[in-house]
Regions:
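N-terminal accessory/interface modules of nucleic-acid-binding and processing proteins
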Residues: 1-197
């Protein structure tokens, strides 16, 4: 988000070229993502749809949009999937983010504890580390969900809301936080997408 706040549909070069039959314009600036799937950290670049041009038989990305007419089906789908309901979908998304972050911590806490050396997180005891991770991840997931669903996230947070993120000060800790935020956001947004379509 920080690199390209206006980005709407991102994919790597090969997906735009091969699956979508679109070309990435020369000189386009990619969005750098940290990728450790190969066993060592490297940058992986994705491009927004606005960086692409069309060819014959090219495909447009199918972007869903949330609006107030979809409030009830989206809220019902979220309640069915996560067991959390609220009269305001924005608050329901925030509550779901908190629940899923807690579940993520329960499943991945040992891996996260193993990478805090050298970061500002290493000064925390076990409970403090858990609190910082949950705070940073929950606020980041909530922001991502609200932004994608078209809510104005700036009205939900103040300048101190994102303070916990600054403790993630090494590439490993940033990657761990980013992976958690990405995985959780993707899961919830797919639930919303199914309800919208």
């Amino acid at each position: 988000y920080a690199q390209r706040p206006d980005a709407t549909a991102c994919a790597d070069f090969d997906i735009w070229n091969n699956r979508m039959n679109r070309y990435v314009r020369r000189g386009s600036k990619g969005i750098a993502l940290l990728d450790e799937s190969s066993g060592y950290p490297r940058l992986h670049y994705v491009f927004d749809v606005s960086d692409t041009g069309v060819r014959r038989n090219s495909r447009d990305p199918d972007l869903w949009q949330y609006n107030d007419d979809l409030k009830q089906p989206v809220s019902d789908a979220l309640t069915a999937a996560y067991g959390i309901s609220h009269e305001r979908v924005s608050q329901q998304l925030a509550d779901i983010a908190g629940k899923l972050v807690a579940d993520y911590w329960d499943n991945n806490s040992e891996d996260i504890r193993a990478i805090v050396d050298g970061s500002f997180l290493m000064d925390y005891d076990s409970a403090g580390l858990e609190m910082q991770f949950k705070s940073a991840a929950a606020i980041s997931v909530t922001y991502a969900l609200l932004e994608r669903c078209g809510f104005e996230p700036d009205g939900y947070f103040d300048k101190d809301s994102f303070q916990a993120i600054y403790d993630f000060s090494t590439p490993d800790t940033v990657y761990a936080l980013g992976a958690a935020v990405s995985d959780i956001s993707r899961e919830v947004l797919r639930t919303v997408e199914r309800a919208v379509k």
